[in-house]
Amino acid sequence: LKERYLPRMLSNDMDELWRCAQFLTEQGAGSDVGNIEVMARAEGDHWLIDGDKWFCSNADAEVILLLARTEGAVAGSRGLSMFLVPRELDDGNRNHYRIVRLKDKLGTCSMASGEVTLDGAVGYLIGELNTGIKQIMKTVSLSRLSHGVRAAAMMRRCLNESRQGARNRCQSGQ
């Protein structure tokens, strides 16, 4: 998997770069990911994934990372595994999932968020079975930090723009 997917996921060449998506949320499993119902069943060297994801960030990306429950896994978050799901299969055909609807959300024009149905989509296990929650929490924790840093930078910019505007303001010719 690393040889096949990582070079394009990490490329600095925008013509070669594959965009990535994260599919976690389901209609009945928003903030409680332990309720995830999307199922993955082993099929040779890959897995077939079925179910619906609800708020899929960057839904039209070339590569998806998603959490699913494998057959026979324990209930709750300890039974979740992470899978890589390519948009296109090795034979050039599209994988077996479809974007049902794009969400009309404020502030996400550059990254479509949508509802996706997986109908036997081919996926590849990343890491070990039942470690998906640990893997995704590392990513989520890092993204929370970056959101905080961006918010602080935006506040500083707003303060600087306001100061500059106040210093250079003319009122009644003065």
Predicted regions and their residues:
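Short Pro/Gly-enriched beta-strand edge/turn motifs at strand-loop
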Residues: W18-T25, L48, N95-R101
